[in-house]
Structure formats: structure tokens, C-alpha cells
Amino acid sequence: MSLALGCVADDYTGASDLANTLTKAGLRTIQTIGVPEAGRALPEADAVVVALKSRSIPADQAVARSREAERWLRARGAAHVMFKVCSTFDSTDAGNIGPVMDALRADAGETVALVTPAFPETGRSVYQGNLFVGSVPLNESPLKDHPLNPMRDANLVRVLGRQSRSPVGLIDTATVARGAEAVAARLDALAQEGKGAAIADAIFDSDLEVLGRAILDRKFSVGASGLGLGLARALAADGRGTRDAAGAAVGEPVGGASACLAGSCSQATLQQVAAAEAIMPVLRLDPARLLAGDDVVAEALAFAEERLASGPVLIATSAPPEAVRALQAAHGVDAAGHAIEAALAAIAEGLVARGVRRLVVAGGETSGAVVDRLGLTAFLLGPEIAAGVPVLRTAGRPEPMLLALKSGNFGGADFFGRALDMMA
């Protein structure tokens, strides 16, 4: 295997989003869960996205896991490695974007890294270094209340500067408008100034293509799926990659039952859970009861077992921001989050034991916990359910499953029903 592009993603849903983007752009793409074991055979691919669950763990652990993934990708021919982060730049002043970026940039031998979470197609744009979600700055969007990484500053030069050991510069809209050569020259100038990173503006998808061309022959970059799109299109224009038809098939239909799990507390997921009540039985578990020691896992599995023969069910721990803050105040941010993730992962394991083979999961941390608990190691990419969310088919599992792993903020109100329809 000789890769045209290697990617290290800091969570599982983000990895699926990026792999979906690369597949649509014509690259044969595989998503692995963690670094594959030695000797594990994978299908031929143009790009591999190594999915880690490293966004909210201690920074030193995130760095170690990311470096291992980068080494694996380089050993398989990846001349360029992209560190995939969330399009809302989810992080705190302690990381993990800055520490991982610093380490991977140093390993790649680069002096400066281009960084942009922009993806205009999904409403994420960067102007003068400020990240916008739709028409509002990041710090005025619902992300200001993110339960793990509340985003209270839209200026990414400042945000990344507080995390990185190196100063951070800016590649502004005017420079991007002048084309790839101007962007490359600006990167070189910033490197001469001692900058270790450069936030790049991008307002239109065409800006992403400019950025992709500018960095294609550099060794490292940081971005969301939008930058992946720019790189994929640059690779295609350069004659690299196979240009497979977009939206690979997921093979033969998968039998068994269907279920949905929701752990995200984003406004989008809360709306999606409410909409799902019109089309399937929904069990809303009270996270406070879980943290008080009640056996909500057994309760959820009993609820599902009574209903799965008749159709899909949805089990949710999603709660509004004020309820989340109260739980975190009482139990601690990490303890509350980990307990809820572990419970949903145990429920997922129980659902699979009861015959579920099509599973939809809402929430990045929840998806990571579920995939780890089920022991899934790699996915093939299928059709797109909503922007950034593909159908995934397990690879290397004796009895295949179909999954959808959704970042909390992605998808319309009808997401759960739409996902199940596309998996049928």
C-alpha cells in the first residue's frame, strides 16, 4: 500500500466525516479505528484515516497516540499527513490541538503548519482568523455551551496561540484570493518570522482548493474535512489517486434489527431526538439516575428487547445545557461524561447481543465509546446520509454491521429516520 494521503483524526465521527469527504472526491478511502495491528491486511487505498479518541484526553496521551498513527501512515507512503480536528475547533487552552500539532509538525520536519477548520459547505468559515458557525462567531453559537470544550473565543489565532509552544500567524482572505503561490509564499514568510502555525481564512469551497494546492507538497497540515476536500481535489488535479466513483457501495444488505443511541447534548441532537419520537419508541434516560447508581443499562435493554421485533428504538441520555452543567457541578466534568459514555457503550453491546446489526450513534465521544466497546477496527465507506455523515460498513468482522456515527451538531431534524432508511 502506497498512500496518496494520510490522516490522523481526533475523534471517530470526525474521521467518518473526513473519510466521507475523501471518498466523494474520488479517493479510495479506508477508516481504521486506531493504528492497525501489525500484519493486519487492508484493502488497497489512496487514503487512510486513522480514527483516534484523543480530543478530550490528557494532552500527553493524545500526542503519543497521534505520533504513533503518523508513523504508521508515513511507513505506508503518505507524503502528506493531515491532523483532522473538528470544524468548530473543539479544544481548551491545554489542548489538545496545539500540543498534537506541535509534535506532528516536528516529526514531519516542517517549520510551519497551515491550519484551518473551515468547511463552507457545512456552514463553517474563517475570516480574518475568526471562526463563524453559519452567520455568527463561534463564541455566540451553541458551541459556547459545549459540555467538554466550551468555545468562548472565535479568534483562532488567539485560541491556538494559547495551546501551542510556537507563535501563530494568519493567512488572510486577500492572500488566499491571490492563489496557491501567494499562500505558499506567506507560509514561508511566517516561518521566517518564527511562526509555527498559520490560521488560514476560507469563505468559499474554492478557497479550500487554493489551500490544498498550496500545501500538497508540504508534509503536514491541520484542518477539518474542508481542508481534506481541498487536498483531495489537488491530488486529483495532480494525477494522484484512482478517481473512484464517489459514494462507494456498502455491499450486500445486512439483516438484523436496528437501533439508535444519542449521547450528544447539542441543540441539533436534542431536536433530532424529539423528532424521532414520531417514528419510533424513544427511551430518555436520566443521566442523574445513572450517576446515582441506578441500573439504567438493564432498564434500557429491557425496553429495547420488548420492542426490537417490531422496529427500531432510540435510547438517549441527551440533556439540555443547564442540566449538563448541574451534573458536571455535582460529579465533575470528566466523571459525568465518562459514566454516560460507558453506559451507552454497554447498551450498544447489549443491543448487538440481541441482534442489532444497524446502529446509529449521535455524539463524538459516545461514538468513540461505542466503537471501542464493540471492538470494531475498520470501516468501508458507503453513501452519505447527511453532510459529513456516511453509512459505514464494518471490515474484518465475521458478521457485518452498518453504522452511522454522527457528530452532535450534524444532520437535520429527520436524521435518525433518514439514516435508518438508508441502511435498510
UniProtKB/Swiss-Prot annotation:
Residues reported in the UniProt entry to bind ATP: S264, G363, G364, E365, T366, G408
Primary enzyme class: transferase
Catalytic activity: 3-dehydro-L-erythronate + ATP = 3-dehydro-4-O-phospho-L-erythronate + ADP + H(+); 3-dehydro-D-erythronate + ATP = 3-dehydro-4-O-phospho-D-erythronate + ADP + H(+)
Protein family membership: Belongs to the four-carbon acid sugar kinase family.
Keyword set, alphabetical order: ATP-binding, Carbohydrate metabolism, Kinase, Nucleotide-binding, Transferase
Keyword Nuclease: no
Single GO molecular function: ATP binding
Protein name: 3-oxo-tetronate kinase
Organism per entry: Methylobacterium radiotolerans (strain ATCC 27329 / DSM 1819 / JCM 2831 / NBRC 15690 / NCIMB 10815 / 0-1)
Pfam families: NBD_C, SBD_N
Domain of life: Bacteria
Entry EC number(s): 2.7.1.217
Protein's UniProt keywords contain Repressor: no
Role of this protein: Catalyzes the ATP-dependent phosphorylation of 3-oxo-tetronate to 3-oxo-tetronate 4-phosphate.
